[in-house]
Amino acid sequence: NQVIREEEAQKLFEQAETLRDTLKRTHEYGYDDARLTSLDQLAEDLIATLHEQNTLVAQRIDLSASLTSDIRDSLAAAQGLSDLSETLVSNAASGATAVISILSELIEEQDRIDESMDALDRLLEEDLYLMERMFELRLRASQTGLLLNQLSRAATPDEVLWIEETLEKNVRILERRTLGISDPVRRRQAGQMMTQLISLSGDTPNVFETRQSLLEIDREIGSLVE
């Protein structure tokens, strides 16, 4: 965290200042050859690098904390949708089973052909279609959770971009599927979870930009220590 960083940075700065003071006293003692001048420059470069690293690490800590918080909230929303979809899939399957049971009884009676056809139409056009959509809702919610976990570990800008494009596509489909939930209470619950997932791309900076910034900071820190 930032407190630990500040404490460690202060120790390094104090050591660097001690080195600078030592070199200064060496000059005062009359040592002033080229090697000492070179050490002076190395000391100044070291101090400048330490300050730059400290600034970058401070930025990294803040960005990392922000990303972790946003991903945690979005993972909770994705898991909530997945849990909700379990109930919706079960309800849809129960509805389809009930219609199939009725259909089995109807087809045994010749004088109820029209009712049989109506039941078959409902099974195909409503119950099975609803079950398919709820299955997809569960699948997309689970995939969204996996993508969010992958984002926190993404190691290249291209990987972040791929996750962003894939996740945004998933969220668009999830939004359509949640709007198709017939139960108003569960539809409202799903809508609240979707608000969090939609904000993934809407915030500025969003989670993808934050991850890209972290990768850039890592590259800058790496270049300083080379």
Placement of each model-derived feature along the sequence:
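Membrane-proximal N-terminal soluble sensing/regulatory segments of transmembrane proteins
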Residues: 1-48, 52-196, 206-222
